Amino acid sequence: MLAWVIIASIITAGFSVALVGMNATKAQGNAAASAFESVARQPEAGDQINRMLLFALAFIETIMIFTLTVALILLFANPLLGKLS
């Protein structure tokens, strides 16, 4: 039973980081492309668009950091292992 929990934790950590990483990268690319297009249409609003883009990128990156934190907890400090041993 303990081996299955370890295997499931490794697979879950790998898939979660990979999937969230791909989606976060795509979301950041879409946000940047939209910001560049908006600045090209309205150059006078460039400072406000830049500020909003940085907030959006920070929120997107926060999701990735939370996922990485959960994956590292599953790999190195798994709370399920203490209950099974």
From Swiss-Prot:
GO terms for cellular component: plasma membrane; proton-transporting ATP synthase complex; proton-transporting two-sector ATPase complex, proton-transporting domain. PROSITE patterns: ATPASE_C (PS00605). Keywords: ATP synthesis, Cell inner membrane, Cell membrane, CF(0), Hydrogen ion transport, Ion transport, Lipid-binding, Membrane, Transmembrane, Transmembrane helix, Transport. One of its GO terms (biological process) is proton motive force-driven ATP synthesis. The record marks E61 as: Reversibly protonated during proton transport. It is found in: Cell inner membrane. The chain crosses the membrane at residues 1-21, 53-73. It is a multi-pass membrane protein. Its main location: membrane. InterPro entries: ATP_synth_F0_csu, ATP_synth_F0_csu_DDCD_BS, ATPase_proteolipid_c-like_dom, F/V-ATP_Csub_sf. F-type ATPases have 2 components, F(1) - the catalytic core - and F(0) - the membrane proton channel. F(1) has five subunits: alpha(3), beta(3), gamma(1), delta(1), epsilon(1). F(0) has three main subunits: a(1), b(2) and c(10-14). The alpha and beta chains form an alternating ring which encloses part of the gamma chain. F(1) is attached to F(0) by a central stalk formed by the gamma and epsilon chains, while a peripheral stalk is formed by the delta and b chains. This is ATP synthase subunit c. It comes from Dictyoglomus turgidum (strain DSM 6724 / Z-1310). The lineage of its organism: Bacteria, Pseudomonadati, Dictyoglomota, Dictyoglomia, Dictyoglomales.
